[in-house]
Amino acid sequence: MYNVLVFGMTENPGGVESFLMNYYRRIDLSRFHFDFLCNSYDPVAFEDEIHAMGGRTVHFTSRRQNPIRFRKELESFFARHAHEYQAIWVNVNSLANIDYLKMAKKYGIPKRIIHSHNAQNMDSRLRGMLHEANRDAVGRYATDFWACSEYAAKWFYAGKGGRGEL
């Protein structure tokens, strides 16, 4: 069994969440197991379906709500459970927070996928600046660079020569 830790689910059943569930519904569950990291204690979109399919949802304090508690909870989870996973698949709209990739590398998850789902900053100016700062840094933590479009690859991976797999 290949165990994958997935980040990208929120309470909103939007584009990224629907993409992940479409993928999860079609994956061979006899070969792959998905667990989902959720940066909120509220139920995420499709949570009941995830559980019914055998997946687990792991909830954390939001970094925005309490950055110190977020970091402590994240560190604790990875210290206890990273050895259970062969991959982490981080699905995001910006690189403002790459803590999941950093922890995955620190605790030895061998395959670390970053997947871009956006082609421009749709958030605050601060998150835009964090995205820019992390564009070059992400190459130290991720092993694989995916994107939903050429534009998304260029916006995320400009520091990597626009490298991204569609």
Label the predicted regions.
Residues 21, 128-134:
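Charged helix-capping and loop-helix junction motifs
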Residues 43-44, 96-99, 153:
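Short, well-ordered alpha-helical microsegments
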Residues 63-66, 95, 107-128, 143-144:
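A short, histidine- and acid-enriched strand-loop-helix "catalytic/donor-clamping" loop
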Residues 74-91:
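Mobile, glycine- and charge-enriched loop segments
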Residues 88-110:
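An aromatic- and histidine-rich active-site surface loop
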Residues 141-166:
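A short, active-site helix/loop in glycosyltransferases that binds the activated sugar's phosphate group
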